[in-house]
């Protein structure tokens, strides 16, 4: 749109344009709209509702009471608005992606069907199912009546439980405002905690308001000494587990009553029903066409990096890339919301707004009225979402939750951890928005990739082969103030970022993975990424126990005592120039739980030995000496472990899914099956951690300690067994006498490291081909000889050479030629490129050159002092040559200035630093003295180290720090010795395993044998 067609009604008001509503709006309008290039904003207040310009037309952003705003009206004009529901109750098939828990009070009786009113007097839980109708894909909200919230209590003899519950409610200020219906009944249940518990009488306490559960449970426990069970189970989980429903999938409702007025949601269709009307269609794993949105914002930083609470730091543009999950990846609808005029962008719908307030309303209503279910972005949890919500709330007093999918009671918030201020991009922030599945692709990429950094450009290059056009935030004010053409360039960059993020979503198919985890774990999709693994296992255990009439007690302080975690077989550090075979226990901790039938329900604790009466040691139960004494676990034929049963059923299901996957040819179905098996794998691996987290939902550290104890024992037994095998024993493992050529009779196996579930076996005297030949047979033979199913050892990989530094830190070359690094940072990421590249050359030489490898092996098996008395092996001299050449390059100025640069972020104003004795601050002060342009907060300040004036030895780093551009322009010599020392320190860290695993010793050797030419 050209600049001449756009006018700002708040700078040039047209009073006859619109009828004025009663509400007054604050608008912050950039001054550059009046005066090109001007900075700052104009504060305008007026009654005009939010407005938008699109294709030369002015439209009101908002809508009527039914929420039909500009996006809805646009759909109606295009013929894509959905039909209304029938006016009578009829069967309904629909897909659910989110489940919400709400509460109705008796005031709602006037707007709900008469047969549902009894559920909400004086108040009652209403479960809302959000999803899509099967018939036409319309968005739906189904209000489900009849679900209860409840918990269990074991009461002392003679206690009137119902009276105690009513007393608790009367003591609650909350209940005086919202009266709660109470039901107490005696039921027969068994506690899951401990073997030998008999079925007994428990009180099931049902409350019509879920917020009363915690208060009443605490009251009964503290005031009356009751033992409380399952008070931490919310109504949503009760709804799913009590009725065997799913959290993501197809439902059928035999009688769905349309709600045509007084709706709770902004969904296209809304219905009322009862729990008993619903059933699940598990056989159908297909998806409807859900709407995914990737967004990005561009902000104006008046005083450096944008700050949401600064009025002038406006959001200038919001890019919105929409994709329907039923479409091919890449078929996106691209939308740009922008302040002011903007030239056309090919393939992008450009909507222009007179102020930030108008644009924010349009953004929130886009999510609502275009029925968005999945929202993604890149680092949006830490920046974009907090920025948008802070602007909306604190600058404009907008309640974003009121513009969401639910008219009342919705949530729209960002939960920042307590340490969020310690590092940009490093805090685990949670976004909770009613009716949306938030997926931050930054967090996904950090979890699934191993890269030097996780900037969007780096990730896009690595995964998509795409180059991201970047605009520095310093350029944004200039581009925006430049007018329509500048905003076009800024908009192209903004839209490009959102499109790349949507490409990443499709690359990982993370939305399908989230849905599959939600289904197996019985939790809503929006809780999968942010709520950790505890809730997944807890819900599954709850479901399994419920089927057998067991109940779960609330954790007590005694459940949270500490225990000794997993240990390792200490590494024999050094360089190994012979094959190193790595064998792994497949799913070690889950297999231990299965093999030893470990569970809350199979455990007999110290002092409870009378429960062993009639049981035979070794045959009916196993005993383990732990920190707190001797614990016993009965075997499967006595009572099957719930945890083991869950694992067995999951693994059997995973095996069946993988079989289907192998035969499946439909790409979409293959994706779903693959994510299903991955979801099962993730959940299985979480079971051990669930028992071992002291502040978790249901900790039992004695189970976790038993698992780690068995893990240690298994490693030690496997080590002794493997080291006792001779070449003849290995030869006997051949499938037939003539299958293998004779093995080296001088060969020897030695375990050089054991890491939780892995053994590193040095195959001394055996060739690489011989090692590969017997690897699988060795693992299988050890499994058969030592362990019971399902515990299994597998040959995972073989190194042709290995640098073993310390536990969980090693570098080696695999037999396929690839280099594998674990826990090793060649040099610090903050090191300059000069140090990084030279250190990499040293490592590559040690791992690849045959003579250097022989020398490295010799060095690692002798005391480092011998290097001073006997000299270095000749084969190691090429390493010294690399270091000497690096020194020469420094001395003769052949190292580009760019390779010598360091950089540090200016995290706050200079006056806010307690100490300014830091290199980057020294350079900042030089900028001030030279009257040069100053870096802004969050800018990275580059610096190099130069020779101190007068060649003073021992000068501080702050005295040596200089601006790289200034140093290059004026020919200031760099601090050669300083950089060379940095290089030697980096090389010593890599080579320390050659010198008694001591980086100080390695540094002294390198300093002794490198030749610094005299000045």
Swiss-Prot record:
It comes from the Viruses. GO terms for biological process: base-excision repair, gap-filling; DNA replication proofreading; nucleotide-excision repair, DNA gap filling; viral DNA genome replication. One of its GO terms (cellular component) is host cell nucleus. It catalyses: DNA(n) + a 2'-deoxyribonucleoside 5'-triphosphate = DNA(n+1) + diphosphate. SUPFAM superfamilies: DNA/RNA polymerases, Ribonuclease H-like. It is an enzyme of class 2 (transferase). Keywords: DNA replication, DNA-binding, DNA-directed DNA polymerase, Host nucleus, Nucleotidyltransferase, Transferase, Viral DNA replication. Gene3D superfamilies: DNA polymerase family B, C-terminal domain, DNA Polymerase, chain B, domain 1, Helix hairpin bin, Palm domain of DNA polymerase, Ribonuclease H-like superfamily/Ribonuclease H. It is found in: Host nucleus. Its EC number is 2.7.7.7. InterPro entries: DNA-dir_DNA_pol_B (IPR006172), DNA-dir_DNA_pol_B_CS (IPR017964), DNA-dir_DNA_pol_B_exonuc (IPR006133), DNA-dir_DNA_pol_B_multi_dom (IPR006134), DNA/RNA_pol_sf (IPR043502), DNA_pol_B_thumb (IPR042087), DNA_pol_palm_dom_sf (IPR023211), DNA_pol_type-B (IPR050240). Pfam families: DNA_pol_B (PF00136), DNA_pol_B_exo1 (PF03104). GO terms for molecular function: 3'-5'-DNA exonuclease activity; DNA binding; DNA-directed DNA polymerase activity; nucleotide binding. Replicates viral genomic DNA in the late phase of lytic infection, producing long concatemeric DNA. The replication complex is composed of six viral proteins: the DNA polymerase, processivity factor, primase, primase-associated factor, helicase, and ssDNA-binding protein. Forms a complex with the major DNA-binding protein BALF2, the DNA polymerase processivity factor BMRF1, and the alkaline exonuclease BGLF5. Interacts with the putative helicase-primase complex composed of BBLF4, BSLF1 and BBLF2/3 proteins; these interactions may coordinate leading and lagging strand DNA synthesis at the replication fork. Belongs to the DNA polymerase type-B family. This is DNA polymerase catalytic subunit. It comes from Epstein-Barr virus (strain AG876) (HHV-4).
């Amino acid at each position: 749109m050209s600049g001449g067609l756009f006018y700002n009604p708040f700078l040039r008001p047209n009073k006859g344009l619109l009828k004025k509503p009663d509400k007054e709006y604050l608008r912050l309008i950039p001054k550059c709209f009046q005066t090109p290039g001007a900075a700052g904003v104009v504060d305008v207040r007026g009654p005009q509702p939010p407005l938008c310009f699109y294709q030369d037309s002015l439209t009101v952003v908002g809508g009527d009471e039914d929420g039909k705003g500009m996006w809805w009206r646009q759909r109606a004009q295009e013929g894509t608005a959905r039909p209304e529901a029938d006016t009578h109750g009829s069967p309904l098939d629909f897909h659910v992606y989110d489940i919400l828990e709400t509460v109705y009070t008796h005031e709602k009786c006037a707007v709900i069907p008469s047969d549902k009113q009894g559920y909400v007097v004086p108040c009652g839980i209403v479960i809302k199912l959000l999803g899509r109708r099967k018939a036409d894909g319309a968005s739906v909200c189904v209000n489900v009546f009849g679900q209860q919230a409840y918990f269990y209590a074991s009461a002392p003899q003679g206690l009137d439980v119902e009276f105690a519950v009513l007393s608790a409610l009367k003591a609650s200020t909350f209940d005086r405002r919202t009266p709660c219906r109470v039901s107490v009944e005696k039921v027969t249940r068994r506690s899951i905690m401990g073997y030998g518990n008999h079925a007994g009488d428990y009180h099931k306490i049902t409350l019509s308001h879920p917020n009363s559960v915690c208060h009443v449970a605490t009251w009964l426990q503290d005031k009356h000494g009751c033992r409380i069970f399952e008070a931490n189970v919310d109504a949503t989980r009760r709804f799913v587990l009590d009725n065997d429903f799913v959290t993501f999938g197809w439902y059928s409702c035999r009688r769905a009553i349309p709600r045509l007025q007084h709706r709770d949601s902004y969904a296209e269709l809304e219905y009322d029903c009862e729990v008993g009307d619903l059933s699940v269609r598990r056989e159908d794993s297909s998806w409807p066409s859900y709407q995914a949105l990737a967004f990005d914002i561009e902000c104006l930083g008046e005083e450096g990096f944008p700050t949401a609470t600064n009025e002038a730091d406006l959001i200038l543009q919001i890019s919105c890339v929409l994709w329907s999950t039923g479409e091919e990846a890449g078929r996106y609808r691209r939308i740009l919301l922008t302040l002011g005029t903007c030239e056309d962008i090919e393939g992008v719908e450009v909507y222009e707004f007179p102020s930030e307030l108008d644009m924010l309303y349009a953004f929130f209503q886009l999510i609502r009225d275009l029925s968005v279910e999945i929202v993604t972005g890149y680092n949006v949890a830490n920046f974009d979402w907090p920025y948008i919500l802070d602007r909306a709330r604190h600058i404009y007093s907008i309640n974003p939750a009121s513009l969401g999918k639910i008219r009342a009671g919705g949530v729209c918030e960002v939960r920042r951890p307590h340490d969020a201020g310690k590092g940009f991009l490093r805090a685990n922030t949670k976004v909770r928005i009613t009716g949306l599945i938030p997926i931050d692709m930054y967090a996904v990429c950090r979890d699934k990739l191993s890269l030097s950094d996780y900037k969007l450009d780096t990730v896009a290059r690595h995964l998509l082969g795409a180059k991201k056009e970047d605009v520095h935030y310093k350029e944004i004010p200039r581009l925006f103030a430049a007018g329509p053409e500048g905003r076009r360039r800024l908009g192209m960059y903004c839209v490009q970022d959102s499109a790349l993020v949507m490409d990443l979503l499709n690359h990982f198919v993370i939305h399908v993975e989230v849905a599959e985890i939600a289904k197996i774990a019985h939790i809503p999709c929006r809780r999968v990424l942010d709520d950790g693994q505890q809730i997944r296992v807890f819900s599954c255990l709850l479901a399994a126990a419920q089927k057998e009439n067991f109940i779960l007690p609330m954790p007590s302080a005694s459940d949270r005592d500490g225990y000794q975690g997993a240990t390792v077989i200490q590494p024999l550090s050094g360089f190994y120039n012979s094959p190193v075979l790595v064998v792994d226990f497949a799913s070690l901790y889950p297999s231990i739980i299965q093999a030893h039938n470990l569970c809350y329900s199979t455990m007999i604790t110290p002092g409870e030995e009378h429960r062993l009466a009639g049981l035979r040691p070794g045959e009916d139960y196993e005993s383990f000496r732990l920190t707190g004494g001797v614990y016993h676990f009965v075997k499967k034929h006595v009572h099957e472990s719930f945890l083991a049963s869950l694992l067995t059923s999951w693994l059997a299901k995973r095996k069946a899914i993988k079989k289907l996957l192998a035969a499946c040819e439909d790409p979409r179905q293959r994706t779903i099956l693959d994510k299903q098996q991955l979801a099962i794998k993730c959940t299985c691996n979480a079971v051990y951690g669930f028992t071992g987290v002291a502040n978790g939902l249901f900790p039992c550290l004695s189970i976790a300690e038993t698992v780690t104890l068995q893990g240690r024992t298994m490693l030690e037994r496997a080590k002794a067994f493997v080291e006792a095998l001779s070449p003849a024993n290995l030869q006997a493992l051949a499938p037939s006498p003539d299958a293998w050529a004779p093995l080296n009779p001088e060969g020897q196996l030695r375990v050089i490291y054991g890491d939780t579930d892995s053994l590193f076996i040095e195959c001394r005297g055996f060739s690489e081909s011989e090692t590969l030949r017997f690897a699988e047979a060795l693992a299988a033979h050890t499994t058969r000889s030592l362990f019971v199913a399902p515990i299994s050892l597998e040959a995972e990989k073989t190194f042709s050479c290995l640098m073993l530094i310390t536990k969980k830190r090693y570098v080696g070359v695999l037999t396929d030629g690839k280099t594998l690094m674990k826990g090793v940072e060649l040099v610090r990421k903050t090191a300059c490129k000069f140090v990084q590249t030279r250190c990499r050359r040293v490592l590559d030489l040690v791992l690849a050159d045959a003579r250097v490898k022989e020398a490295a092996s010799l060095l690692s098996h002798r005391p480092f002092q011998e290097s001073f008395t006997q000299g270095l092996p000749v084969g190691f001299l090429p390493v010294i040559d690399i270091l000497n050449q690096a020194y020469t390059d420094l001395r003769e100025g052949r190292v580009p200035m760019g390779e010598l640069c360091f950089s540090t972020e200016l995290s706050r104003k200079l006056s806010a630093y307690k100490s300014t004795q830091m290199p980057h601050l020294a350079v900042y002060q030089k900028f001030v003295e030279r009257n040069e342009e100053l870096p802004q907060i969050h800018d990275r300040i580059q610096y190099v180290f130069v020779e101190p004036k007068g060649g003073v030895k021992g000068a501080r780093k702050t005295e040596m720090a200089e601006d790289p551009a200034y140093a290059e322009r004026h020919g200031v010599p760099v601090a050669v010795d300083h950089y060379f020392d940095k290089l030697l320190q980096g090389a010593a860290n890599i080579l320390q395993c050659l010198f008694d695993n001591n980086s100080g010793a390695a540094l002294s050797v390198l300093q002794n044998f490198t030749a610094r030419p005299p000045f």
